Amino acid sequence: HLGLDAWAGFPGAAPDENAGRPGDDGRFRLGVTHAPYRRVLDAMTADGADLLLAGHTHGGQVCVPFLGALVTNCDLPRRQASGVSTWTAAGRTVPLEVSAGLGTAPSAPVRFACRPEAVVLDLVPRG
């Protein structure tokens, strides 16, 4: 945490002259959000994020075998409720990891066909 968490692109956020500024300086840019709403993923991708990380969906929490998640608790497509996929916005496509997490929603304290997970990502330099 570098004190750059007041992302200027989020509605109602306090402006931060360093946050949300795309660049071509070769630095790796990580976009992290609790809930993967499309507008947030779109804005982070447009702002230059190289990798997007999110949670909130609990992997759908209740899944149907061979069909997948029934809900995502946001506007993310159900097929992206957990795991690695890609997100395309503003002419860019970046990896998206949505963790199913360990817990459940307070309103529905149950999981079915949706294993809890703690994700470990190994990031290696390109090249």
Where are these regions (language model features)?
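Intrinsically disordered, low-complexity coil segments
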Residues: 19-26, 88-94, 126
